[in-house]
Amino acid sequence: MGEPSREEYKIQSFDAETQQLLKTALKDPGAVDLEKVANVIVDHSLQDCVFSKEAGRMCYAIIQAESKQAGQSVFRRGLLNRLQQEYQAREQLRARSLQGWVCYVTFICNIFDYLRVNNMPMMALVNPVYDCLFRLAQPDSLSKEEEVDCLVLQLHRVGEQLEKMNGQRMDELFVLIRDGFLLPTGLSSLAQLLLLEIIEFRAAGWKTTPAAHKYYYSEVSD
């Protein structure tokens, strides 16, 4: 994570005081309350799906900066605690705000993608991430395009890593996805297309073949 990337974080949607807090956390983590920083990032991620897509990169940079400066992991601990709280209340979150739920799944997958221990994804996040994806593959979620879209995007992003960590759960997830694809009603044509694409993407070793890319992406753009 090079220094210039610090200015690339999309933090313009925060108020000036919070922007300053985040900038300080990236440069001088010991000077701020890192638990507060973790809460600010999670709160904003649940409201802003654009930010939740790249919050993992910022969290990774703060964790690196804190470790380098003080050899501590206050921020990481605060972040994981808050992720766990939201995870435990995920059904309530989904019932309250579908957008908040989709943002949460995007965020936890983003964190899983970026956070590493000895260059391996964090084991503590594997089952929570799987549980979120399993929820997205339930029939009532598959009838909502934003949830199907989230499921497919996250599998594109972290599916291969997740399968390496627990292949059996990925097999079970794809049984649900295939069953969902065959649902007699309730699935839009776009949702069917997205599910078929992710089934073929995994079957091809988590790669899109040129022919599939041309077919699916011309269909989606139409």
Swiss-Prot record:
Pfam families: MIF4G
Keywords: Cytoplasm, Nucleus, Translation regulation
InterPro entries: ARM-type_fold, MIF4G-like_typ-3, mRNA_TranslReg/HistoneTransl
Biological process annotations from GO: cap-dependent translational initiation; regulation of translational initiation
Broad class of where this protein is predominantly found: cytoplasm
UniProt-listed SMART domains: MIF4G
Subcellular localization, as worded in the UniProt entry: Cytoplasm; Nucleus
GO MF terms, alphabetically ordered: identical protein binding; RNA binding; translation activator activity
One cellular component (GO) term of this entry: nucleolus
Domain MIF4G, residue spans: 3-205
SUPFAM superfamilies: ARM repeat
Gene3D superfamilies: 1.25.40.180
The keyword Cytoplasm appears for this protein: yes
Family the entry assigns: Belongs to the MIF4GD family.
Function: Functions in replication-dependent translation of histone mRNAs which differ from other eukaryotic mRNAs in that they do not end with a poly-A tail but a stem-loop. May participate in circularizing those mRNAs specifically enhancing their translation.
Subunit structure: Interacts with EIF4G1, EIF4G2 and SLBP; probably tethered by SLBP to the 3'-end of mRNAs ending with the histone stem-loop, it also interacts with EIF4G1 which is bound to their 5'-end.
Other known facts: Depletion of MIF4GD results in cell death and reduced histone mRNA translation.
Protein name per Swiss-Prot or TrEMBL: MIF4G domain-containing protein
Organism: Homo sapiens (Human)
